């Protein structure tokens, strides 16, 4: 798949639902306009059976990068899903998940992401 460098599409990607780009929107725009293929990654832990609305914007933006021809990776952490993420949890006990629970959670997450990200696209797969 060739890289789409249409400036209006890139401008929308960098402004719609985007608060900040690090190091800067200007630098990322220059790279996107150059036609250089990027690899964009989102990693997550399937600690529950469903996504929440807060995830949607990230996945919509990931799909926009994919539509422009960039390689996107939607990674679900197996081990980190099983042990739980301690970030901002203080001393709260974390429920340990079995491998089977994580596999089932991952399947439901992929089903929920499919309407937003074209994970089955043969030309530029996720």
Regions found by a protein language model. Give the residues of each.
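NTP-dependent nucleotidyl-transfer catalytic core
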Residues: 1-126
């Amino acid at each position: 798949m060739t890289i789409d460098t249409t400036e209006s599409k890139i401008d929308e990607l960098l402004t719609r639902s985007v608060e900040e780009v690090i190091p800067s929107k200007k630098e990322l725009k220059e790279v996107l306009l150059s036609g250089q293929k990027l690899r964009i990654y989102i990693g997550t832990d399937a600690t529950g059976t469903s996504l929440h609305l807060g995830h949607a914007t990230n996945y919509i933006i990931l799909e926009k990068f994919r539509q422009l021809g960039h390689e996107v990776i939607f990674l679900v952490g197996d081990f980190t899903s099983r042990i739980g993420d301690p970030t901002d949890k203080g001393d709260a006990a974390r429920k340990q998940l079995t491998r089977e629970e994580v596999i089932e959670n991952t399947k439901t997450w992929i089903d929920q992401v499919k309407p937003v990200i074209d994970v089955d696209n043969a030309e530029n797969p996720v």
